[in-house]
From Swiss-Prot:
Record-linked PROSITE patterns: LCN_CSAB
Organism whose genome encodes this protein: Centruroides tecomanus
Annotated protein name in UniProt: Beta-toxin Ct16
Molecular function, one GO term: toxin activity
Domain remark text: Has the structural arrangement of an alpha-helix connected to antiparallel beta-sheets by disulfide bonds (CS-alpha/beta).
Domain LCN-type CS-alpha/beta: 21-80
Disulfide linkage: 31-79, 35-55, 41-62, 45-64
GO terms for biological process, alphabetical: defense response
Family membership: Belongs to the long (4 C-C) scorpion toxin superfamily. Sodium channel inhibitor family. Alpha subfamily.
Residues the record lists as Threonine amide modifications: 82
């Protein structure tokens, strides 16, 4: 039984499992991308290797679904360099 568990864990490590996340993508200044149209956000998110994206109208910001874990997303309200 222990060998089965060890083999199972080793298989996952070898497969390099990529996790996905959802969130607001950010630029180099940690600022969200402003938007008006869903098409703009969908293209932006897919360029960042996400599955899809849309314009979240209440915040006028792009929201991406299925972003790779290594892609930065908005974690604070701070936007460096622009005062926003």
């Amino acid at each position: 039984m222990n060998y089965f568990i060890l083999l199972f864990v080793a298989t996952f490590l070898l497969l390099d499992v990529n996790c996905k996340k959802d969130g607001y993508p950010v630029d180099a200044n940690n600022c969200k991308f402003e938007c008006w149209k869903n098409e703009y956000c969908d293209e932006l998110c897919k360029a960042k290797r996400a599955e899809s994206g849309y314009c979240y109208k209440l915040k006028l910001s792009c929201w991406c679904e299925g972003l790779p874990d290594d892609e930065p997303t908005k974690t604070s309200d701070r936007c460096y360099g622009t005062g926003r």
